Amino acid sequence: MTITKSQQYLTHFRNIGIAAHIDAGKTTTTERILFFTGRIRNLGETHEGASQMDWMEQERERGITITAAATTAHWTHTETGEDYTVNIIDTPGHVDFTIEVERSMRVLDGAVAVFDSSQGVEPQSETVWRQADRYGVPRVAFANKMDKTGASFDLVVNDIRERLGAIPAPIQYPMGAENDFKGVIDIVRMQAHTFTNDLGTEIQVGDVPAEYMDKVNEMRQQLIEAAAEVDEDLMMKFLEGEEPTQQELIAAIRKGTIDKQIFPVLCGSALKNKGVQLLLDAVVDYLPSPLEVPSIKGTHEDGETVTEFPADPEGKLAALAFKIMADPYVGRLTFVRIYSGTLTSGSYVYNASKDKRERVGRLLKMHANSREEVTELKAGELGAVIGLKDAGTGNTLIGDGDDRVLLESIDIPEPVIKLAIEPKTKADQEKMGVGLQKLAEEDPTFKVETDQESGQTTIAGMGELHLEILVDRLKREYKVEANVGAPQVAYRETITKQVEVDSKFARQSGGRGQYGHVKLRVEPLEPGAGFIFENAVVGGTVPKEYIGPAQKGVEEAMQSGPMLGFPVVDIKVVIYDGSYHEVDSSEMAFKIAGSMGLKEAVQKGSPAILEPVMRVEVTTPEEYMGDVIGDLNSRRGQIQGMEARGNAQIVKAFVPLSEMFGYATDMRSKTQGRASYSMFFDHYTQVPTNLAQQLMKK
C-alpha cells in the first residue's frame, strides 16, 4: 500500500470502540484511557455515578451507558515515544440499546472487547461480538477485573475460543489474581510489568520472574505458532526453527488481527488503573489505522455502479452521520465520521439520503462533555456538526454538486414492545409532541404513533428499560409529565398461502372519472425476509408511471393488517397485469387500487399473527434449575440447552415476549434472588391458533 503525503497523518490515527456486556467495566476502562491520555484531571467512578463518558443524568443514576459518546484523545506509545490520536466511541452494554452499538460499529476501524474475568463471555458480550463480526471490525480483548474474587484469565481465553468460536492470542499473562493481582507479563517483549502504586501510574519493568518462566515460554511458543499461521514469512522462520524478532512478531500479530483471524488478549483492572497503558500500546500496535481497513464504498443511483472512497483528505467528500443529539446549548448536533475528503465549517454539503443541500454551521471535536471548535474535519476524523437540519442516522453526506452516491447504511431493528402514553395536563400535550419527535430523531429504534380514530399516542422500542429511559428523558429534558400504560407486545401480521387478486378502482361522477386496475400475486416469504415488490407487467398494460403509485398503495395498506391492525410483514407482492384508461387514470387511482388489492389479498391469504420471540439465558444455582426450567416451559418456552459454568447452570431458551412481562420478579422469588437473566429479541414466529383467537377477542 502506497501512502501519499496527504495521507501520512492517518497512520497515527486509531478509531476504536469499547464494547462489552453491561457491568464488565467498559465505561471505567474508557475513563482510565482518558485519564492516561491526559484528557481527564480527576477520575469518576461509574458505581459512584460520576463518570466522564456517562453524561446524561439517567446514565449517572443507573451506572449504565446509554448514548455512545465520541471522544478524541492522544497517546504517546510507551516504547517508541510516537504520538497517536485515538478517537473513542463508548458503546452501551445493555441490550435495549443495541442500535447504539450498531451505529458505532459502522464508524469504527477497531474495537476493544472488555470482559469481566470472573464471568468470562456473557450473553451481551456475545451479541456485541457478533455485531462486530458482521461489520468486519478487528478486535483486541481485555480481561478486566483481574483483582475481583473468582477472576480467571484462562476462563476468558477459553470462552473466546469456545463460546465465540474465535482464535484468542494471549499477548499477556497476569502475575497473581484476585487480591494478589500485582502485574502483567508482556509475552511479546518478555518483560514483567509490576504496579507499584495505587494509581497504576508507576510501573516497574523487569525480567519475567522465574516461577512464571515455564508457563510464559509455552504461551510464547503458542503465540508464535498462531502468528505464523497468518504470516508466511514468519511461518518459514518457524519451520526452520528460528526465533522471530520482536518487530517481526508484532507485525505478524498486527496482520492477523487486522485480517480478523486472531484476537490478541490482554488483562488488567481498569478500576485499579492496572494494565491500561499497555492496552493503549496494544491499540496502537495491533488495531488498524483508517488506511488499513477496506475503503468505504458508495452505490450510485442506478443501484449498480459502485465508487470507492479511499481515506484521503484531498479526495472527494464522503461522510456518514451516525448519531443525532439535542444539545441544550447549541441545539441539534449531528455526529459524523469523515471517510474521505475534508468537511469545512460554513460550506455546503449534499445529503444524498434525503436529496437535500445543507449548510454546515460550526464543527466540534468532542470530549466526553466538553468541546473544542475546529474549522475542518479531515478524512479519518470524527466530530459533530451544528447546523444540519435534515440529516438523520445513517445518512450519507457528500460534496455539494457531486454525483449522488449512498454509503452502506445502518441496520435498524424493528421495535418489539410498545406502550400507550398520555400527557397529564393540557399544557403537557404540546410539549409531549415536540419532545417525542426529538427523541425519535435521535433514536431510530424508537417509534411514535398516534391512532387516527382514538387520538391515543403509543411509543414503541427495544425493551422495557429502553422505553422507561425515554419516558424519563421526556420528563427531565422536555419537562413533560406523562402517564404510561402497561407494556404491550408489538405483534406483526402475515399470510400463509399464495393468492391472486384482481383489484379495480373506478369512479364516474360527472367530468373526469377515476380509473386504476391492477392484478396482484401475493405470496408468503421466510420469517424475517421483509417485503419484496416486483413489477412483472409486460406489454404496457399498466404504464410505468403508475407502478410506483400502486406500490405506494400496497405499502400503505401493509401498515395495518386485518386481524389486529398490526403491520403486515414477510410478503412478496408481484404486479403482473392490469389496465388503464387514457383519460381517467391517475396516480391516485392506482394507489387506491394497489391498497384495496393488498387488503383483499391478506384477507384471502389465510392471515396469521406473528409474535416476537426472545432469546433468554438464565444463570442459576444448580438447586433451582428444575424450577427455572419448569417456569420457562410454562411460559411457552423452548429450552435450547444447558451448560455448567462454575457451580452455576446456564439455561438457554426461546420464549415469546408476551410471556416474559414480570419475569424478573417471579424468577427472584423462585430462586431467592440468586439467579440472573438476560433476554434479547431473536425472531418472529406464528402465534398458535387458540392464542390468536384470544388476542382477536380482546
Swiss-Prot record:
Ranges for domain tr-type G: 11-291
One Gene Ontology term of the molecular function aspect: GTPase activity
Name this protein carries in UniProt: Elongation factor G
Binding site for GTP: 20-27, 90-94, 144-147
Coiled coil: none
This protein's encoding gene: fusA
This protein's UniProt keywords: Cytoplasm, Elongation factor, GTP-binding, Nucleotide-binding, Protein biosynthesis
Subcellular localization(s) per the UniProt record: Cytoplasm
SMART domains hit by this protein: EFG_C, EFG_IV
GO biological-process terms attached to the record: ribosome disassembly
Function: Catalyzes the GTP-dependent ribosomal translocation step during translation elongation. During this step, the ribosome changes from the pre-translocational (PRE) to the post-translocational (POST) state as the newly formed A-site-bound peptidyl-tRNA and P-site-bound deacylated tRNA move to the P and E sites, respectively. Catalyzes the coordinated movement of the two tRNA molecules, the mRNA and conformational changes in the ribosome.
